[in-house]
């Protein structure tokens, strides 16, 4: 076996470090919690949520990508721990070939990009729900299916694009690692992903404010006002998820980028210490079902109280005009 396939001393030190093992255990804990949270999130989305059918389709697709990522990364985390505990005496058996890792890396990228593109798909669907003159069940399903297919194509192609011309001739510590020949392309993907999550956040806030602005147009029509409030609440939940994803994604991409820039100026041990904790994708995958459950339950409770207020509230026309004027100032 060639020397290229044998782990260097710094790789062995990294695998043997307490920081690496702790970070992998934390990631595995996040993965396990994500599985349980996803189970309850799926039940709530299907049976108890206030979302339109198109939104449910996309939320379930996002939950699929969440678990696809967690499963693929969880397998690799277990492998890292196994090599760190039991294979340090076999340095020429630790590394994995980039050729064998390529299919696994592509699956990992499908899950990663699927979570990001899926959030964009949710916001596009919310835009349709907000600005379309009619958004009936049949139209909602058609839009949801079309957007989900676009997300599927984009997420599936991401891994293939990153590895497009990679010769895959090297060896790596784990299949989640990117070979040197495609690092610039992967860095570009990370930056674009952060920009996209920022775009998602801005669009979600714009849609939310747009809905709030016209909330009182139907003040004296209980049914129409309820539909408008339902739209605001469902969009608010998606906006909340977009904010969470942006914060974690910014921490990931910005942290990794800074570490790569200063890598030559710091010790390898310092670089690997921080890069283990900047990799926040397992927490992005965990927070999606957890926050989804939280928002649905909180909104349902608040919605019940608001419905009581809508049906019992008495307001004069002058009060209504004053409220509209205050809203526009």
Curated annotation (Swiss-Prot):
Keywords: Membrane, Transmembrane, Transmembrane helix. It is a multi-pass membrane protein. It is found in: Membrane. The chain crosses the membrane at residues 26-46, 68-88, 104-124, 143-163, 187-207, 238-258, 273-293. One of its GO terms (cellular component) is cilium. It holds the Pfam family 7TM_GPCR_Sra. GO terms for biological process: detection of chemical stimulus involved in sensory perception. Coiled coil: none annotated. InterPro entries: 7TM_GPCR_serpentine_rcpt_Sra, Nematode_rcpt-like_serp_alpha. GO terms for molecular function: G protein-coupled receptor activity; olfactory receptor activity. Belongs to the nematode receptor-like protein sra family. This is Serpentine receptor class alpha-6. It comes from Caenorhabditis elegans. The gene is sra-6.
């Amino acid at each position: 076996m060639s020397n290229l396939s044998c782990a260097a001393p710094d790789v062995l030190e990294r695998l043997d470090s307490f920081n690496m093992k702790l970070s992998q255990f934390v990631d595995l804990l996040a993965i396990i919690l994500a599985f349980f949270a996803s189970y309850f999130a799926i039940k709530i989305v299907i049976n108890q949520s206030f979302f339109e059918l198109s939104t449910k389709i996309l939320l379930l697709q996002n939950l699929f990508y969440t678990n696809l990522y967690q499963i693929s990364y969880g397998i690799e985390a277990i492998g890292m721990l196994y090599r760190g505990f039991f294979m340090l005496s076999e340095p020429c058996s630790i590394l994995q070939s980039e050729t064998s890792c390529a299919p696994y890396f592509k699956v990992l990228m499908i899950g990663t990009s699927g979570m990001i593109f899926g959030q964009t798909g949710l916001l596009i669907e919310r835009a349709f729900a907000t600005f379309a003159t009619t958004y009936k069940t049949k139209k909602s399903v058609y839009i949801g299916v079309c957007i989900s297919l676009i997300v599927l194509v984009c997420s599936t192609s991401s891994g293939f694009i990153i590895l497009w011309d990679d010769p895959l001739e090297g060896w790596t510590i784990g299949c989640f690692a990117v070979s040197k020949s495609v690092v610039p392309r992967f860095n570009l993907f990370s930056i674009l992903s952060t920009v996209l999550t920022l775009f998602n956040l801005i669009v979600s806030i714009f849609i939310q404010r747009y809905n709030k602005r016209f909330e009182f147009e139907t003040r004296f029509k209980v049914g129409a006002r309820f539909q408008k409030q339902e739209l605001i609440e469902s969009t608010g939940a998606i906006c909340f998820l977009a904010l969470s994803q942006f914060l974690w994604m910014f921490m990931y991409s910005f942290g990794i980028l800074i570490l790569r820039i200063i890598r030559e100026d710091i010790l390898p041990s310092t670089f690997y210490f921080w890069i283990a904790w900047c990799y926040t994708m397992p927490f992005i995958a965990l927070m999606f079902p957890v926050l989804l459950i939280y928002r649905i339950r909180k909104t349902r409770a608040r919605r019940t109280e608001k419905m009581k207020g809508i049906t019992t509230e008495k307001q004069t026309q002058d009060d209504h005009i004053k409220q509209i004027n205050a809203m526009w100032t």
